């Protein structure tokens, strides 16, 4: 596996593959890799001759009071995991390599509409940071295919929109959420949880399944289902950020006429913010 820290070397590597007629898959990450990330790499390997994985903790997508400094960095462990699943190159740029003029002078990319609600409302500027860094990485790697987890469903839709709207020649693949045996969605931030908190956190998935069963059983009082879920989780010590059944395309509150829905959830367990979602077809 090639270990690359400069944009110029990354481009040389990809261009050499291209000259050989080989395809390129891409998996952007912030590191601290778990089985969910490795599943993305395996999917990319199944689709492409070569796979690039980036590890970059992107300061542009963190707010002033968020966990940029505390975010776990486990580069050596990450490299070993990537070798084990057959990644061909890992791109490890510095902040200076990615933003040579500094964050304040950086041109940015913003996806209107779907960036504004839910995680976008809770974390102002977050999706602007995501859209900007992903656009830069796509321009560097020029992948045929890029792979993202469905756990960050809103992020996935933002990236699909920017690729479509900016006429990018990349196919975006969403990969189903990888879960622990308890149902808890795998996340790098799960490492912040104590053993007891982690056991309790599995209740999010249990409650989401209850909402899904209610909707599939014909209940269209979405507010009632949401409120019951929040009440049950708050009784277990969670604090609500948001919990809403939305139209899967617009992210607006679901109506009785909508068929493709997604339940979007963000809850705090202590200081740790946990997000999850469940797609539902009526």
UniProtKB/Swiss-Prot annotation:
Its EC number is 6.3.2.1. Pathway: Cofactor biosynthesis; (R)-pantothenate biosynthesis; (R)-pantothenate from (R)-pantoate and beta-alanine: step 1/1. It is found in: Cytoplasm. GO terms for cellular component: cytosol. It comes from the Bacteria. InterPro entries: Cyt_trans-like, Pantoate_ligase, Pantoate_ligase_C, Rossmann-like_a/b/a_fold. (R)-pantoate binds at residues 61, 155. One of its GO terms (molecular function) is pantoate-beta-alanine ligase activity. It catalyses: (R)-pantoate + beta-alanine + ATP = (R)-pantothenate + AMP + diphosphate + H(+). Beta-alanine binds at residue 61. ATP binds at residues 30-37, 149-152, 186-189. The active site is at residue 37. Keywords: ATP-binding, Cytoplasm, Ligase, Nucleotide-binding, Pantothenate biosynthesis. Pfam families: Pantoate_ligase. Transmembrane segments: none annotated. One of its GO terms (biological process) is pantothenate biosynthetic process. NCBIfam families: cyt_tran_rel (TIGR00125), panC (TIGR00018). Catalyzes the condensation of pantoate with beta-alanine in an ATP-dependent reaction via a pantoyl-adenylate intermediate. The reaction proceeds by a bi uni uni bi ping pong mechanism. Homodimer. This is Pantothenate synthetase. It comes from Alteromonas mediterranea (strain DSM 17117 / CIP 110805 / LMG 28347 / Deep ecotype).
